[in-house]
């Protein structure tokens, strides 16, 4: 991660597959005070960056549909800019699952720009392969698979809105193993050994944010020791990650249905980290999905 102090001009390259939210992210950056240039032909990139300019932060939208798109050119440009005093180049990658990208194109009835007629999945796969080196090089990766436009705005503002030097940001989430592991997660803890409230009729329809469910889960004799050891592990590792320059860490707790045990554990862990002064956000994947299905 390059220097992003207030004395350095931020230059953010923004890319990602079609349908992942690149245009929305650029709009947020423009609202945050960035000069935004979208779809700049890569053959003009060097000349554009050589032009003297103000200290206003700059966001460059990189569209893989451009005829001269090249991951090598972009990576080389980032490397070149990194060595220039007073500049802070970064790569923001908007990621999204293939399934959700396909659904978004189906819902909008748009044709994927790289796909043969009526075969959008082929275009999505091709585009993701093209973007692979940039995803691996990304300084900030935002997975928009389960984000709405408001949540995406909050994520982009968190990383790039004015406010000085970034701190390590911690994301804590719960999930269901039935639906698979979350994408781009750093640490995963399995809560399925804890007593399951699902088998208690009066608790089945509730979730882990409810006091009765929390009381039931935390009453398990193994809960306190498990929670304490997880807290201790995170509090040991977070300063080390921060000191190494890591700016984002994702911690996930899973159980069978993602409704009870993992939710309680995620809530408790996020609260503990916040009490220690860490910047924490929390989300419950399955609860959010259910809420979206009901609206």
UniProtKB/Swiss-Prot annotation:
InterPro entries: P-loop_NTPase (IPR027417), RapZ-like (IPR005337), RapZ-like_N (IPR053930), RapZ_C (IPR053931). ATP binds at residues 16-23. Keywords: ATP-binding, GTP-binding, Nucleotide-binding. One of its GO terms (molecular function) is ATP binding. It comes from Roseobacter denitrificans (strain ATCC 33942 / OCh 114). The keyword 4Fe-4S does not apply. GTP binds at residues 63-66. Belongs to the RapZ-like family. This is Nucleotide-binding protein RD1_1380. It comes from the Bacteria. Displays ATPase and GTPase activities.
